[in-house]
């Protein structure tokens, strides 16, 4: 298996994202999130006993999983796929297709890894990382890499939410967030110990329930251990203003 040059991949990622406005807190958030997901994938793969080559590949898949977010924010000023397009599909376009003529930067998968031997696996790990469920027809190896990226993404989203404002994440001010209530489908997902589907989130507060539900569907034991060790899942629901509010009272 061809070795992956992490320095080359980091440099390619930085070169691409430097063209976007890192003073925008939402761009900065996604850059930081990307690095954290890559490291989470590395940590989980190591703890699960993967080979050194597969650890590197898991790290790279984590680094590339959100490549579509930067164009999504530039074109539509939102992270909501329903109000723009699938950021996963956009990431595939950026890495494996043609970049738009007005994009501030262009890149290609070959900027990150010389060989094309892993292209289909990398493509799948990006394409399916935010899907509610993985396709049934995936082969076992591809599913393993998709699972580790999805786990790494969930783990760091917990940190991201805890460290960010609701305006940065949802483009909703705090008053509107606190005025919202949990919707019935979201609470049903919580009671069923499963993730919340996008079309089940009807209120800003539902995003918080969805975050907590991530813990139910982490695949790897090492992912669950890492999430518990980091403790980020507890921080959003420990805020004083949430504890005093109906939203916090339910949790």
Residue spans of the language-model regions?
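Conserved small/polar residues in nucleotide/adenosyl-binding loops
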Residues: 240-247
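Alpha-helical phosphate/pyrophosphate-handling elements in metalloenzyme active cores
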Residues: 27-60
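Active-site flanking loop/helix segments enriched in acidic
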Residues: 12-36, 70-81
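Short alpha-helical hairpin
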Residues: 2-19, 63-68
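Short helix-capping/linker segments at secondary-structure and domain boundaries
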Residues: 216-227
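Divalent metal-dependent catalytic cores for phosphoryl transfer on phosphate-bearing substrates
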Residues: 50-218
